[in-house]
A protein has these predicted regions:
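Conserved nucleotide-sensing/catalytic segment adjacent to the nucleotide-binding pocket
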Residues: 29-83
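Extreme N-terminal starter segment of soluble prokaryotic enzymes
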Residues: 1-5
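Walker A/P-loop
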Residues: 15-16
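Walker A (P-loop) phosphate-binding loop of P-loop NTPases
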Residues: 11-12
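Residues at the beta-strand->loop junction immediately N-terminal to the Walker
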Residues: 7-8, 66
Length: 85
């Protein structure tokens, strides 16, 4: 369990909290997709920018990525060894 996706049904269900606590417990960096999707002043990243950020993360040996964004789901799913729903 080195490359982990944390997804859920909607916002506010505890994905971020769970991912943070899991990351602390197993000493793996946690990446919250909202940080990469939302730029200053609530401007949305382009699909290219958002995808590139995730490609950089999944190239690492260990990661936890938290978030539901379906338009880039495959980037994470193809590289994850564990998916937690």
């Amino acid at each position: 369990m080195n490359q982990i996706m944390v997804i859920g049904i909607s916002s506010g269900v505890g994905k971020s909290t769970f991912a943070r606590k899991l990351g602390e417990a197993i000493d793996i960096n946690v990446y919250h997709l909202d940080v990469f999707y939302w730029k200053p002043n609530w401007v949305e990243a382009t699909l290219e920018e958002f995808s590139k950020a995730q490609q950089e993360i999944v190239s690492q040996r260990q990661w936890i990525i938290e978030g539901n964004y379906s338009n880039t789901f495959e980037i994470r799913a193809e590289n994850a060894d564990t998916i937690i729903y």
